[in-house]
């Protein structure tokens, strides 16, 4: 399972011209579920995201988590994070889980974020073509994998 985490001032997801989710200060997560992933990977990553200290404290030092600052999370499923580009020029997505497996794990990941104390967890539309807009804060972008 792979998560690309971006600290944002705001972010939103639009599907077919309609905004389906938006957040203020917090994290935009692009989440890729692999064929071999399970609840252990999803749970570990959710706790890591909730606990990662990447927000500034009173001195400006990265010392606070999204949970500490009461930030929001916008999680977007993105199977292309599992692309294999080692051979040829067309990415292979063989390592990505099929939708029947990926969607429940994505939902489990989001539920575990809530259980870990993240005040607001919103999502895009699983499997849809989405327009994702964001205002980076920093920028701070981190890739997490388990």
Swiss-Prot record:
Residues making up the signal peptide according to the UniProt record: none
Cross-referenced HAMAP family: Deacylase_Dtd
Catalytic activity: glycyl-tRNA(Ala) + H2O = tRNA(Ala) + glycine + H(+); a D-aminoacyl-tRNA + H2O = a tRNA + a D-alpha-amino acid + H(+)
Function: An aminoacyl-tRNA editing enzyme that deacylates mischarged D-aminoacyl-tRNAs. Also deacylates mischarged glycyl-tRNA(Ala), protecting cells against glycine mischarging by AlaRS. Acts via tRNA-based rather than protein-based catalysis; rejects L-amino acids rather than detecting D-amino acids in the active site. By recycling D-aminoacyl-tRNA to D-amino acids and free tRNA molecules, this enzyme counteracts the toxicity associated with the formation of D-aminoacyl-tRNA entities in vivo and helps enforce protein L-homochirality.
EC number: 3.1.1.96
Main location: cytoplasm
InterPro entries hit by this protein: Daa-tRNA_deacyls_DTD (IPR003732), DTD-like_sf (IPR023509)
The protein, known as: D-aminoacyl-tRNA deacylase
Residue numbers covered by motif Gly-cisPro motif, important for rejection of L-amino acids: 138-139
């Amino acid at each position: 399972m792979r998560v690309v985490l971006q600290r944002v001032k705001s972010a939103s997801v639009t599907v077919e011209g309609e905004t389906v989710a938006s957040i203020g200060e917090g994290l935009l997560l692009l989440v890729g579920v692999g064929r071999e992933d399970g609840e252990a990977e999803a749970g570990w990553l959710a706790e890591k995201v909730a606990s990662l200290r990447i927000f500034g404290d009173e001195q400006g030092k990265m010392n606070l988590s999204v949970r500490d600052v009461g930030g929001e999370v916008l999680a977007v499923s993105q199977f292309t994070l599992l692309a294999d580009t080692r051979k040829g020029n067309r990415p292979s997505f063989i390592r990505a889980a099929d939708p029947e497996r990926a969607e429940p794990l994505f939902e489990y990941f989001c539920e575990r974020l809530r259980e870990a104390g993240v005040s607001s967890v919103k999502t895009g539309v699983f499997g849809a073509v989405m327009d994702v807009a964001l205002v980076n804060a920093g920028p701070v972008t981190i890739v997490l994998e388990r």
